[in-house]
Amino acid sequence: MPADIRIVPCLTDNFGYLVHDPATGATASIDAPEAAPLIAALDKEGWKLTDILVTHHHGDHVGGIAELKKKYQCRVHAPHDANAKIADADVRLQEGDVVRVGDLTARVLETPGHTLDHLSYVFDDDRALFAADTLFSIGCGRVFEGTYPMMWESLLKLRALPDDFKLYCGHEYTASNVKFALGIEPDNAALQARAKQVESLRAEGKPTIPVTLGEEKQANVFLRADVPSVAAAVGMPGAPAAEVFGEIRERKNNG
């Protein structure tokens, strides 16, 4: 049976996610920005939390773990090299591991850059990618701990997934990301279409995710650093893609 996925707004602009297996009743939270909204969503659905899948150690992604674990006695799956930072972890994960949530399965991808321990979770059967702060809609995370080449390789790993996968990211940053991207690719038709869609969704108070990876590949300038016209637009024709990506990320940092 397909997973039931619920988007749970948390904190100021974080997304929490509940992934429920209707066949077994198992439910996973992808990260735990804060406990109260997730508990409310679980209560509304009549679900019990069985697992938390942590993407990285930043406080706005793990702040609710202790309370949720105490309430539900759920298993906490966390990056293998975040041991000292996520003390509540029961299972340590690395590239190629598989997490089972009831009858659902998630592949673990290491996607370092934003942090060195960052993981993304791929639910192949449900065509869902939970990329947290590696890949945003029309954006990507700041590179706090890694390097620009490292982050670019992580983005390439996610870009290689099929177009029909849906992206579930860590924050509602899409409107500001669109504004920035249009400054580099004002004539990108896919980006223009996404901009209109985002404006409409936000006007209705709706989240801008999920979005398909196919759409992101056409409209997200951070995934397009190896496109010659993008390199030219930032004054780096012929430069290596990782360097072009770094320039785009620096512009976003300073914008």
UniProtKB/Swiss-Prot annotation:
State what protein this is by name. Answer: Hydroxyacylglutathione hydrolase
Q: Which residues form a coiled coil?
A: none
> Which SMART domains does its entry note?
Lactamase_B
> Which co-factors does it depend on?
Zn(2+)
Establish whether keyword Isomerase is in the entry: no
From what organism does this protein derive? Rhodopseudomonas palustris (strain ATCC BAA-98 / CGA009)
Task: Name a biological process GO annotation.
Answer: methylglyoxal catabolic process to D-lactate via S-lactoyl-glutathione
**Which leading EC class covers this enzyme?**
hydrolase
Provide the taxonomic classification: Bacteria, Pseudomonadati, Pseudomonadota, Alphaproteobacteria, Hyphomicrobiales
